Design a protein with these regions (language model features):
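Bacterial N-terminal signal peptides that target proteins for export
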Residues: 1-10
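A conserved catalytic-loop motif detector
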Residues: 15
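Subset of outer-membrane beta-barrel
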Residues: 25-312
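Cleavable N-terminal signal peptides
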Residues: 11-12, 22
Length: 312
């Protein structure tokens, strides 16, 4: 059976950009989280046809501080199915963690204004710690400093519901607790849960207010929240702010170019007086490519949409 052209494009993007996406934090922590739900919810893979690349650099003045790069590509297919590929990685000090996964989703049409997407995720978690990468003045090698590398499976699931201008997301991108990745430092990846919701409110014909909230819960850690609000002008320019329950705040912005590219930026820093003296500035940038604008909708998807319209 011949591989559809759209799938070839998806795998092309994945093959080319996979090496670039070399470094994610265990807990999803992006300021522009509502634009990057595909990284935590496999159900999101069937909604848009796009390629997405983002980077997040924390604590800019500190050497070997956390650096995150993420890549995703996704597309709806015929028969209400959708697919996606994701790479999320993080490097910090001598450690690097990379999660590579594939998603599949199925769309349920509830009404003309409401749809539910169900998603499953499978992939692998790659961990590496290299104490030998530390530069020292000594020419001798410490025999206790050995490179630690391990692999573990990734299994996740998610649900995404849209109703008019409201959306709701729940996902568990990692349903299996991963332990003993590095026995020397007791490296463990816990089961994670994410719940998010958003509502877009039209103020005028040109201006729209977008609000979103996400709650995170990881085993053995307290739940954290993040709230964002932004003002959009004709879906071309968007400016907003994000607040973290940890005491950080961020200013965000996004620019849409000819319905083809979206470029976003966020500047985050500590708001708490106890930590504001520390240099905890974080810069975050992403670019999203609308593949539908480049490739056009596939005949299979257009046919499915026409059938759904006739049935309604």
């Amino acid at each position: 059976m011949a591989i559809p052209f759209r799938l070839k494009i998806i795998f092309f993007f994945g093959t080319i950009l996979f090496p670039i996406s070399s470094w994610t934090q265990e807990v999803f922590n992006y300021a522009n989280f509502s634009e990057q739900l595909q990284f935590i919810n496999p159900a999101f893979s069937g909604i848009e046809t796009k390629a997405f690349l983002s980077t997040r650099n924390q604590w800019m003045s500190i050497d070997n501080a956390p650096q995150t790069t993420s890549f995703a590509v996704s597309s709806p297919l015929k028969n209400n199915l959708g697919v996606g590929l994701n790479v999320l990685s993080n490097s910090m000090f001598v450690q690097s963690r990379t999660i590579a996964s594939a998603d599949i989703s199925y769309k349920l049409t509830i009404s003309e204004q409401s749809e539910i997407y169900l998603g499953l995720r499978g992939g692998g978690y790659f961990y590496r710690a290299d104490p030998l990468s530390l530069s020292t003045s000594s020419q001798l090698t410490d025999p206790s400093q050995q490179v630690q590398a391990s692999f573990a499976p990734v299994i996740g699931a998610g649900l995404y519901w849209t109703f008019n201008s409201f959306w709701l997301s729940y996902s568990a991108p990692q349903l299996v607790k991963l332990g003993n990745l590095d026995p020397t430092i007791n490296s463990v990846i816990n089961i994670q849960h994410y719940a998010a919701a958003g509502f877009n409110f039209s103020l005028t014909e040109n201006f729209q207010l977008k609000n979103a909230l996400i709650l995170r819960k990881s085993e053995n850690f307290d739940a954290t929240q993040q709230y964002s609000s932004s003002l959009s002008y004709q879906n071309l320019i968007e400016l907003g702010a994000t607040y973290y329950s940890s005491g950080n705040g961020a200013l965000t912005g996004m620019l849409n170019i000819s319905n083809l590219f979206s470029i976003g930026y966020a500047y985050e820093k500590a708001l708490s007086s106890q930590t504001s003296g520390l240099d905890r500035r974080t810069h975050e940038i992403f670019i999203s490519v609308n593949l539908d604008s480049i490739l056009g909708k596939s005949p299979e998807i257009e046919q499915d949409e026409e059938v759904e319209t006739n049935q309604q």
